[in-house]
Amino acid sequence: MFFQSILFLFSVLNGFFTIPKRGYAKECSNYRTIALISHASKVMLKIRQARLQQYMNCELPDVQAGFRKGEERAQIANILWIMEKGREFQKNIYFSFIDYVKAFDCVHHNKLWKILQVMGIPDHLICLLRNLYAGQETTVRTGLGTTDWFQIGRGVHQGCIFSPCLLNLYAEYIIRNTGLEEAQAGIKIAGRNINNLRYADDTTLMAKREEELKSLLMKVKEESEKSWLKAQQSEN
């Protein structure tokens, strides 16, 4: 069947362009790359994305609200509610807000394919994604000329409908490996221990004691570095 095919025929029509964000225009870090994708590619990707979304919804816990329909504002409301209850019952609650440096740009491709396998994503979907990212090259233009072309091995396509799902699964793998689900640190809500709330890669850690929060934070940082993500200085 056509839709079972794992060949991706339209990637040749795709391109990447840089868009200035803010700040000094000659600073590379002040630009964001965005993928421009042909209409034929978008039709194919939309069909595949709907299938990937089904697997993603089964794998992600309810503490993850990133890019999930109807959940966009849930975590802000949850954090505010927890803070209000802490004041009401005069309980100390410690928070740490983790923001990764350029998370979309730092996703390691080979690591991503392994994570998708661990998450139970079908081989034909993984193969399609690999084809979408295969053979990517870039060059850098400087005042001294243009560099040789070199392979790109990191970063998901910003502007592609697949990318939010891929980042969610990548971030979920990191949190699973930290063992936060089994950790005793956290706060009790309706008999359930909660120590993290997430929106994609943005993670809020919480605990009743400062030492517990530091322990959670170190676990997340260590696992993040193993997957080539770097956490910015957290706001506590």
Task: Enumerate the language-model features and the residues they cover.
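Structured loop/turn residues at secondary-structure junctions
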Residues: H39-A40, R192, K208-R209
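Short secondary-structure junction motifs
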Residues: D62, Q90-N92, E182-Q184, K226, ...
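Catalytic palm subdomain of template-directed nucleic-acid polymerases
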Residues: K102-M119, G155, L197-K226
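Short, conserved micro-motifs composed of acidic
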Residues: L144, A231-N236
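A shared catalytic/ligand-binding motif for oxyanion handling
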Residues: A171, Q184, T203
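N- or domain-start disorder-to-order transition segments that initiate the globular core
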Residues: N177-T178
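Active-site nucleotide-donor binding segment shared across nucleotidyl transfer reactions
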Residues: E181-L197
